[in-house]
């Protein structure tokens, strides 16, 4: 019999859609992928070259479980330059992707019966991780009023994802301020930080430079197109980092060595130029998707970050997504996979080429007008 903890895990809706899309492709159909949250760009050349160089130099062994010092120093410098925050390398641990960092963060602070506040809708792994660890996810709107209602004596943490998946929104300052005043721990998932096209996106560091309550999760997958390299990091206080270090030592030893060395080049000027070019292209695609979505008559917020648009289509999103995929071979993610409030929504990922996105949107237009 399987573990009871695993029974609380729900399937990942986007992967179910992807599996069907790939089956259709194996049958010769041309599927337009607007479901996957993965940059279509290749990893910038300086990063790839450094990865190859590290292999040739024999850097294929374990590293310090905290991660190589050079990379932690680079991350420390990044937060000092961007936020004037004095984050020392010892308050940083490198992980095998930001999802692992998130799991470590939750594992280090929550016990059976604790409650963790999460946004509805939000990244599906949040609720699965929380339940797996014996705690309870509490879904709420990210307004002060909703958070006040959700608080209880069992509240241990809140997960703030900004820019958010699937909404593409950034979280308001008042939400951070409320969280720091009322909640023991703030887990700040900032994996899309940097992918912002207008306005201001806060970092938790701006509200808690001493890291008394903050567990900041970030990585290289989204901004640097390094999804397959599996490299992320956690920033927090000494107590939390030491707890995560124990988990890392026992479960994973260290993050992938070649990925750590390759990531050193993420901070180079040449890489920065490539990233800026990617961001401009993402913004161009965002504007294209928003134009079509509004022409379809769908209600939509103003997504200013990440690479998702999350419209209300006025009907069951799951039924719509599967029917669209089978009839027009366009893959979208049903909104219900992100929370109960996503039932009549779909998520459109614009992490695909401009041409493919336009073709996919034209197919949706045909589907709606049939």
From Swiss-Prot:
SUPFAM superfamilies membership: PLP-dependent transferases
CDD domains (UniProt xref): AAT_like
Residues with PTM N6-(pyridoxal phosphate)lysine: 222
Catalytic reactions of this protein: 4-(hydroxymethyl)-2-furancarboxaldehyde phosphate + L-alanine = [5-(aminomethyl)-3-furyl]methyl phosphate + pyruvate
Pfam families per record: Aminotran_1_2
Keyword field contains NADP: no
EC number: 2.6.1.108
Protein localization: Cytoplasm
Organism lineage: Archaea, Methanobacteriati, Methanobacteriota, Methanomada group, Methanococci
Cofactor section: pyridoxal 5'-phosphate
Protein name in UniProt: (5-formylfuran-3-yl)methyl phosphate transaminase
A GO CC term assigned to this protein in UniProt: cytoplasm
Superkingdom per UniProt: Archaea
Pathway: Cofactor biosynthesis; methanofuran biosynthesis
PANTHER family on file: ASPARTATE AMINOTRANSFERASE, ASPARTATE AMINOTRANSFERASE-RELATED
Oligomer and partners: Homodimer.
UniProt keyword annotations, A-Z: Aminotransferase, Cytoplasm, Pyridoxal phosphate, Transferase
Molecular function terms from GO: pyridoxal phosphate binding; transaminase activity
Summary of the function given for this chain in its UniProt record: Catalyzes the transamination reaction between 4-(hydroxymethyl)-2-furancarboxaldehyde phosphate (4-HFC-P) and alanine to produce pyruvate and 5-(aminomethyl)-3-furanmethanol phosphate (F1-P), the precursor for the furan moiety in methanofuran.
Keyword Transferase on entry: yes
Similarity field: Belongs to the class-I pyridoxal-phosphate-dependent aminotransferase family.
Main subcellular location: cytoplasm
GO BP of this protein: amino acid metabolic process; biosynthetic process
Top-level EC class as recorded in UniProt: transferase
């Amino acid at each position: 019999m399987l573990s009871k903890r695993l029974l609380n895990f729900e399937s990942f809706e986007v992967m179910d859609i992807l599996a069907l899309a790939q089956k259709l492709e194996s049958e010769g159909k041309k599927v337009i992928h607007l479901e996957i949250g993965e940059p279509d760009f290749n990893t910038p050349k300086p990063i790839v070259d450094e990865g190859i160089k590290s292999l040739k130099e024999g850097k294929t062994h374990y590293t310090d479980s905290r991660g190589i010092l050079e990379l932690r120093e680079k991350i420390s410098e990044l937060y000092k330059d961007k936020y004037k925050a004095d984050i020392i390398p010892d308050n940083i641990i490198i992980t095998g992707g930001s999802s692992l960092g998130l799991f470590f963060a939750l594992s280090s602070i929550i016990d059976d019966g604790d409650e963790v506040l999460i946004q509805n809708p939000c990244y599906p792994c949040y609720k699965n991780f929380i339940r797996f660890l014996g705690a309870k996810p509490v879904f709420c709107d990210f307004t002060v009023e909703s958070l006040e209602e959700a608080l209880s004596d069992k509240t241990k943490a809140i997960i703030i994802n900004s820019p958010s998946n699937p909404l593409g929104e950034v979280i308001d300052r008042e939400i951070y301020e409320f969280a720091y005043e009322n909640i023991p721990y703030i887990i700040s998932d900032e994996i899309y930080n940097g992918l912002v096209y207008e306005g201001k996106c806060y970092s938790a560091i701006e509200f808690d430079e001493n890291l008394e309550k903050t567990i900041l999760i970030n990585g290289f997958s989204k901004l640097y197109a390094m999804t397959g390299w599996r490299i992320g990091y956690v920033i927090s206080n000494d107590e939390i980092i030491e707890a995560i270090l124990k988990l890392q030592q026992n479960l994973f030893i260290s993050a992938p060595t070649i990925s750590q060395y390759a990531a050193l080049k993420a901070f180079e000027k040449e890489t920065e130029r490539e990233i800026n070019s990617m961001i401009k292209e993402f913004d161009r695609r965002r504007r294209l998707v928003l134009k079509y979505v509004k022409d379809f008559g769908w209600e939509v917020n103003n997504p200013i970050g990440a690479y998702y648009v999350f419209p209300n289509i006025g009907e069951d999103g799951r039924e719509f997504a599967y029917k669209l995929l089978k009839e027009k071979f366009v893959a979208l993610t049903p909104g219900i996979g992100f929370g109960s409030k996503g039932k009549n929504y779909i998520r459109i990922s614009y992490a695909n080429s401009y041409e493919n996105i336009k073709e996919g949107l034209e197919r949706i237009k045909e589907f709606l007008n049939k």
